[in-house]
A protein has these predicted regions:
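Hydrophobic alpha-helical segments at protein termini of multi-pass membrane proteins
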Residues: 1-110
Length: 110
């Protein structure tokens, strides 16, 4: 069973959501931190930035959010395997909304 929306498979849309969310949040945070009035309030992100691990963590998160569901989708063939795509979709949406918030802060800082 191939699930699709407007000709795009749900699987590819899930991976694109994760990619757009993680990359968008990372870039908007980097840009936002260039402004003196904007500070990072997430203590985990502050810890990662102070130790030079922030980019590595986001790259690993992107790899896991795409790699693990892709592996599971190909390893098992039962119909419920589509549920694993909730992980990259939800992660991508959460990071996408963080990106929107960051852009909002950047615009307000002008």
């Amino acid at each position: 069973m191939d699930l699709s929306i407007y000709g795009y498979s749900i699987e590819s849309l899930a991976y694109l959501t994760a990619l757009a969310g993680i990359v968008g949040d990372h870039l908007s945070t980097r840009i936002g931190l260039l402004y003196p009035m904007i500070r990072e309030m997430n203590p985990f992100t502050v810890f990662l930035r102070q130790n030079g691990l922030w980019l590595l963590f986001d790259v690993l998160m992107l790899g896991v959010s795409i790699g693990v569901p892709a592996l599971l989708m190909r390893k098992w063939s039962f119909n419920g395997r589509w549920a694993v795509l909730a992980f990259p979709i939800l992660l991508g949406l959460a990071r996408f909304f963080a990106m929107v918030y960051n852009v909002f802060l950047i615009v307000l800082s002008f």
